[in-house]
Amino acid sequence: MLGLPELVTACLFDLDGVLTDTASVHRKAWAQAFDEFLDGRGEPTFTEQDYENYVDGKPRADGVRDFLASRGISLPEGDADDGADAQTVLGLGNRKNGLLLERIHSDGVAVYDGSRRYLEAARDAGLRRVVVSSSANTADVLHVTGLVPSPPHHRLRHHPAHQRR
């Protein structure tokens, strides 16, 4: 039924873009963060093309730097603990992440129906299942989507090489 060799005992599933549509939530959070930043600067608003060209799939700070550079704007780097209102690269990235978390919890995150069915079929077949992601917000997404195993016999670990999205 699953189309897997009989020797397979576990499956890894990527959270972002395979199980869930987090890209649309990221896109909205980036647009809000950048539009708030650009407001009053005489710059056009953040577009879908800007998302594709400058931030999609990049570590958060790289996305901020690349987008601002496309508009001829530079900010100091700042510190990882900069507040969301800090006029720094990392502050703007933190603002975006705060907006993302608000959207995750208020609007939810769409789960792809076919992926949910496959994940459930893997469970029913007795296969171990692991969800992987480079996102710092993995636990939040798993919680709001209901993809956390029940009962929760799992451990969430977050050790990305660098901060993403």
Name each model-derived stretch.
Residues 1-3:
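A short, basic/flexible loop-to-alpha-helix module at the beginning of a structural domain
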